[in-house]
């Protein structure tokens, strides 16, 4: 089965998906949406599930904890989105992965690839989703329970 990961922001969401053997993470895309209107993300998730013929058995959400491990406003946003996902897709497990530093790693990877600033900005969330999913595939994550 496959895992679908998210790097969720207030106006963008980057997606990555695992291979069927759950060995590697592959970038999908980043979508833009109206600030804090996650219905567009749900619609995109439905498209991805259909595209991958219902082979996705888990969602992996980047969980933006502060460096001291405490929750922030963005963490609460992800908590609310996890509830939305759980209600919309009750048969799919949800895991939370500490995403601390994933954006910095993504920016470093994209800078090393010598992409333009415009390309870097458009790819950052997708690369972050890949990093989050790779972390999950290597180390696991915290299972989300309603």
From Swiss-Prot:
List GO molecular-function terms, semicolon-separated.
nuclease activity
Q: Which UniProt keywords apply?
A: Cytoplasm, Hydrolase, Nuclease, Ribosome biogenesis
Q: Which GO terms describe its biological process?
A: rRNA 5'-end processing
The cross-references to InterPro entries, in alphabetical order and at most eight, read: RNaseH-like_sf (IPR012337), YqgF (IPR005227), YqgF/RNaseH-like_dom (IPR006641), YqgF/RNaseH-like_dom_sf (IPR037027)
Cellular component terms per the entry's GO annotation: cytosol
Subcellular localization, per the record? Cytoplasm
Q: What is its main location?
A: cytoplasm
Disulphide bond pairs: none
Q: Name the EC number(s).
A: 3.1.-.-
Per its UniProt entry, what is the enzyme's top EC class, as one word? hydrolase
Q: Does the keyword Endoplasmic reticulum apply?
A: no
Return the similarity comment: Belongs to the YqgF nuclease family.
Record's function text: Could be a nuclease involved in processing of the 5'-end of pre-16S rRNA.
Name of the protein in question: Putative pre-16S rRNA nuclease
User: What organism is the protein native to?
Assistant: Mycoplasmopsis agalactiae (strain NCTC 10123 / CIP 59.7 / PG2) (Mycoplasma agalactiae)
């Amino acid at each position: 089965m496959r895992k679908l990961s998210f790097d969720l922001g207030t106006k963008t969401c980057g997606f990555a998906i695992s291979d069927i053997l759950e060995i590697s993470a592959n970038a999908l895309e980043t979508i833009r949406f109206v600030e804090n209107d996650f219905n567009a993300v749900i619609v995109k998730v439905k498209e991805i599930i259909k595209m991958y013929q219902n082979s996705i058995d888990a969602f992996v959400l980047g969980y933006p904890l502060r460096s001291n491990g405490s929750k922030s406003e963005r963490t609460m946003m992800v908590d609310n989105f996890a509830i939305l996902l759980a209600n919309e897709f009750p048969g799919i497990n949800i895991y939370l992965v500490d995403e601390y530093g994933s954006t910095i790693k993504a920016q470093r990877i994209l800078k090393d690839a010598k992409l333009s600033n415009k390309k870097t900005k458009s790819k950052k969330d997708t690369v972050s989703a890949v990093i989050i999913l790779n972390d999950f595939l290597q180390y696991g994550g915290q299972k989300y329970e309603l």
